Amino acid sequence: MKVLLLQDVEHLGKAGEIKDVSGGFGRNYLLPKGFAVLATKSQVKQAEERLAAQRRKAEAARKEAEALAARLAELTLTFTVKVGEQDRLYGSVTNADIAAKLHEVAGIEIDRRKIGLEDPIKRTGEYEVPVELMSGVSSTLKVVVVGE
């Protein structure tokens, strides 16, 4: 029996795939639970159209992320903070601070969790901070911390 998967099914396949399953598995599990429908010509055509639309949307998002990555690579964020002895900061510069400054300076909205700052910055200097925009698309952002 050929079925079109509506959801990801563990050990079987991903949503949108057409799979050949035993009749009992299809009738007793996949169809009643709503995990799949019978693979008719119209269902297959609709699934192909959905997959094509998803691919187009993903490609557009990837192009947008690559353009943003190029823009981030050219940016330099400068933080002016109070410092104590040996150029140590009072406080620190965190990934949330970098995200807020990025929005303030360049109007770019990035989730703080995508900024790959391992530990908060606690000293003055120049830092290269990785930013993971999406899977496979990343950039580095130059952050300069100077004392008052």
Swiss-Prot record:
Disulfide bonds, paired cysteine numbers: none
Record's keyword annotation contains Ribonucleoprotein: yes
Keywords of this entry: Ribonucleoprotein, Ribosomal protein, RNA-binding, rRNA-binding
GO molecular function, one term: structural constituent of ribosome
Source organism superkingdom: Bacteria
Family per record: Belongs to the bacterial ribosomal protein bL9 family.
SUPFAM superfamilies: L9 N-domain-like, Ribosomal protein L9 C-domain
GO cellular component: cytosolic large ribosomal subunit
InterPro entries: Ribosomal_bL9, Ribosomal_bL9/RNase_H1_N, Ribosomal_bL9_bac/chp, Ribosomal_bL9_C, Ribosomal_bL9_C_sf, Ribosomal_bL9_N, Ribosomal_bL9_N_sf
Gene symbol of the encoding locus: rplI
Main function: Binds to the 23S rRNA.
UniProt entry tagged with the keyword Transmembrane helix: no
Organism of origin: Chloroflexus aurantiacus (strain ATCC 29366 / DSM 635 / J-10-fl)
Gene Ontology annotations of biological process type: translation
Protein name (Swiss-Prot/TrEMBL): Large ribosomal subunit protein bL9
Pfam family, one: Ribosomal_L9_C
